[in-house]
Each structure stands twice: as structure tokens, then as C-alpha cells.
From Swiss-Prot:
Enzyme class, first EC level, given as a word: transferase
GO molecular function: ATP binding; tetraacyldisaccharide 4'-kinase activity
Protein name: Tetraacyldisaccharide 4'-kinase
Superkingdom: Bacteria
UniProt gene name: lpxK
Origin species: Francisella tularensis subsp. novicida (strain U112)
Pfam families in the cross-refs: LpxK
Upper lineage: Bacteria, Pseudomonadati, Pseudomonadota, Gammaproteobacteria, Thiotrichales
Protein role: Transfers the gamma-phosphate of ATP to the 4'-position of a tetraacyldisaccharide 1-phosphate intermediate (termed DS-1-P) to form tetraacyldisaccharide 1,4'-bis-phosphate (lipid IVA).
Annotated metabolic or biological route of this protein: Glycolipid biosynthesis; lipid IV(A) biosynthesis; lipid IV(A) from (3R)-3-hydroxytetradecanoyl-[acyl-carrier-protein] and UDP-N-acetyl-alpha-D-glucosamine: step 6/6
GO cellular component, as recorded: plasma membrane
Length: 322
């Protein structure tokens, strides 16, 4: 229901009714920001925060992965911190290792650890400052720390802020919660160092973005399919015009389905689960075992223990400045 009222070009009646509450939300958020900034922790290691000003999936984690890969290619030593949404670690800060389950560290950290082939330290903590201090102590030669989300975590000083925007949803009706999808007023964009817009942006929205500096356009591109059971990799054309069942338990499943369709794949059925869904074998009961199942990387991480031979995930990359 909220999606229907939030993602309109103009606020509807319900949004207008909720606006007074949004003003209270903004006031509380501003006071919290000021309070946190007064006791901000400043690390000697440069910190990049990759976040957003709206709720829901915008594509932050692919950006974090891309940045880490770029730094590795340059011979630098990056580290990643995350809140670890949904994590149930025994204690914090918690370092992700090869034996860590997604239930312990959260979906995104587990996926990033797998995608970066254990080359990058990943530490989670609800209080990100704890994660930074852990890296400072245990990985003192770290060149840069990338924070996956945390734009509004003002307890932590940052050297660069990157905001990720979904080109389709953009900023919705441009109102703050609960009248709209924004965590902070849209004017916050004037303070950040870079804005990365992912997807096909309309000319109208591009005009809006001219008001802000350092806007970069990117597109999610399919790179290859990876078998969840065997880790075998095949070209993205392998499933051209084949029938598949698409599974998604992410913040914005429409983006995933669109990427599949752009790869000339015939989706015979779509199964959508809530973001961060904890998959079990029972979720796949009733699915025709003869039809190929394709899901996101983030979902595949949680299905390894019961995956079938014809289950695959689609790996992606960002094509910048398309």
C-alpha cells in the first residue's frame, strides 16, 4: 500500500494527511543527527559511505562490491563494514569468515564475502564505530573502509559520501517518512560527494538531477549464470529463450525480473518473497523440478544447503556512465 502512495510524481491525499507526522519525523531525525555529530568518531583510515536517502533497495551493495574490486585492482587493501541487517551473531563486532552463515552476518555481508573471494575483510556491527575500531586493530594496514549503507549513521565521520538512487523509483513523491519514502529531505543530496543513479533514467528526472553535483549514471548488466550447487559458470546467453522460474527475496524484485527479461529469458513464473527472507526447502515445494530456477546472488547464498542441480543465480555488474 505504501508503495502506491509513495511512488507517485505528486503527493496524493493520504500523503498530505501524513505530512504533519513527516515534519515531526524530520525534526527528530535532525536532532538525532546533531547529537551524533557532536560525538562523532573519526578514523585515521579514510571511510567511504555508500547509502541512500530513501527506503528500499536501490543497489548499494553492487556499488560496494564494485568499489572494493576497483581498489583491489589498484593494489590497495579495502575493508567493508555493515550493520548486518537481520544478523544473529553471538557477539559484535563480528568478522565474516569462510564458515559464516548468512543468518549470522546478514545477507549482504555473506554475499560480498563470497563475491570478493575472501580478499576483503568484512566486519559487521549495529554500531558501525565498533566495526571500524575492529578493523583498525586487526587490519591496521587497511587503506580504505567502505560502509555498506549507513548514510544516516552520523556517529561515524566519513571522508566521502555516495548516494545510490534507483532510476525507476527515484525519490517518489519527494516527501519524508511516513508520507513518502525519504529518510532525509531531498536537499541532503546537495551535501553528498557523488550520486549514482542505477537504471534507465527519464529525461524529466535527468533535469531534476542537474541541480546536484557529480551525478553518475549506471546500469545493472547480467554477466553470467552460476550454478548454486556446483559453482559452475556459464555465459549469460546460455538460457536465452529458455523457460525459467524466477525467485526474488530482495527490496526491489522488479529490477531483477527486468534484468532477466532483457537477457531474453522466458519467465514462466515469478515467486516474490520479502526482503531478507530466510529461505528453507519448503519455500520451493510445488515447483516443477524439470524447470530451471534462477534467483539473485543474495538469495542463492541462503539456498546452498538444499539447492538442486538446475538452480542458478544471475551474477551482475555495474556498467558506469551508460
Amino acid at each position: 500500500m505504501l508503495d502506491k502512495i509513495w511512488y507517485r510524481s505528486k503527493p496524493n491525499l493520504l500523503s498530505r494527511v501524513l505530512q504533519p507526522i513527516s515534519l515531526v519525523f524530520i525534526d527528530i531525525a535532525n536532532k538525532r543527527k546533531i547529537k551524533q555529530q557532536l560525538k562523532q568518531y573519526k578514523s585515521k583510515i579514510p571511510i567511504i559511505v555508500v547509502g541512500n536517502i530513501s527506503v528500499g533497495g536501490t543497489g548499494k551493495t553492487p556499488v560496494v562490491r564494485m568499489l572494493a574490486q576497483q581498489y583491489l585492482a589498484q593494489g590497495k587493501k579495502p575493508a567493508i563494514i555493515s550493520r548486518g541487517y537481520g544478523a544473529k551473531a553471538d557477539n559484535y563486532p563480528f568478522e565474516v569468515t569462510s564458515g559464516t552463515l548468512a543468518t549470522q552476518c546478514g545477507d549482504e555481508p555473506a554475499m560480498l564475502f563470497d563475491a570478493l573471494q575472501a580478499q576483503v575483510p568484512i566486519v559487521i556491527a549495529p554500531e558501525r564505530v565498533q566495526a571500524v575500531k575492529y578493523i583498525e586493530k586487526n587490519f591496521p594496514d587497511t587503506d580504505i573502509i567502505i560502509s555498506d549503507d549507513g548514510l544516516q549513521h552520523y556517529k561515524l565521520a566519513r571522508d566521502k559520501e555516495i548516494v545510490v538512487v534507483d532510476a525507476i523509483r527515484m525519490f517518489g513523491n519527494k516527501l519524508c517518512l511516513p508520507a513518502g519514502p525519504l529518510r532525509e529531505p531531498i536537499e541532503r543530496l546537495k551535501e553528498v560527494d557523488q550520486i549514482i543513479v542505477i537504471g534507465n533514467c527519464s529525461d524529466k528526472d535527468k533535469e531534476l538531477l542537474k541541480n546536484y553535483k557529480n551525478v553518475t549514471y549506471a546500469k545493472v548488466v547480467a554477466t553470467e549464470f552460476v550454478n548454486i550447487l556446483t559453482a559452475k559458470k556459464v555465459a549469460k546467453t546460455e538460457f536465452n529463450h529458455q523457460n525459467v522460474i524466477a525467485i526474488a527475496g530482495i527490496g526491489n524484485p522488479t529490477k531483477f525480473f527486468k534484468t532477466l527479461e532483457e537477457s531474453a529469458i522466458n519467465i514462466t513464473a515469478k515467486k516474490v518473497f520479502k526482503d531478507h527472507h530466510k529461505f528453507t526447502q519448503s519455500d520451493f515445494e510445488g515447483i516443477d523440478s524439470d524447470i530451471t530456477v534462477v534467483m539473485t546472488y543474495k538469495d542463492a547464498i541462503k539456498c546452498k544447503n538444499f539447492a538442486k542441480a538446475n538452480w542458478w543465480y544471475l551474477d551482475i555488474a555495474l556498467d558506469i556512465n551508460v
